[in-house]
Amino acid sequence: MTQYVIIGDGISGSSAAETLREEDPESEITVITDEGEPLYNRILIKEHAKGKLPEAPISIHDEEWYDERDIDLSLNTFVTSVDTDAKVVNTHEGEEIPYDKLLVATGGTPTQLPVDNSDADGIHHFWTFQDARAIREHAEQANKGVIVGAGLLGIDFAAVCGAQGIEADYLMRGDRWWRYALSGKGAEIMHEGMREVGVEPV
């Protein structure tokens, strides 16, 4: 019996687990994620943070989906190391999970703000459903915000501020938003759109 371990429960990890179960019905499949819920639509979490969507439409799979397919789902589990010689995944709780085949499907993560107190209360990074919940909770009580980072996640933050009626300064390292991809004229169109919802590019 083959033991498969998948680190990451995004769309890649979840789809891999589903395909493995179809192709190898007798195998053992374990999916490990450091998040607190099963697969959800990451694109829609900004709509939740805006206050426009409840949680239900964002979820894609519930825990029952994994149970029905005999897939062992480990939530809130951090992988601390992988011993490729022994073929063992080690977790933060000291558990050793053996594997015959391992898939690392963790995806990317946003750059953390490289300053002291970047994890203080009221400072948010925007990537997970948990992040979106915290942003929504704080946004509903806030009057002023600051956005750091002139990329796609930053523009999502700007949209959240606009939807929640929060005036915000948008701090950008360069002279315009997404300077690597947009012309000056294109960026200015985006800047004007931000200003219309109360977000000022700086």
Regions flagged by a language model, labelled:
Residues 1-5, 62-146:
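FAD-binding core/adjacent interface of flavoenzyme oxidoreductases
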Residues 2-72, 160-185:
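Beta1-alpha1 glycine-rich phosphate/pyrophosphate-binding loop at the start
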Residues 8-11, 127, 148-153:
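Glycine-rich Rossmann-fold phosphate-binding loop(s) that bind the pyrophosphate
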Residues 13, 38-39, 88, 111-112, ...:
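Flexible, glycine-rich phosphate/dinucleotide-binding loops
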Residues 62-73, 189-201:
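Helical element adjacent to the flavin cofactor pocket in flavoenzyme catalytic cores
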Residues 147-171, 195-198, 202:
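Rossmann-like dinucleotide/phosphate-binding beta-alpha-beta segment
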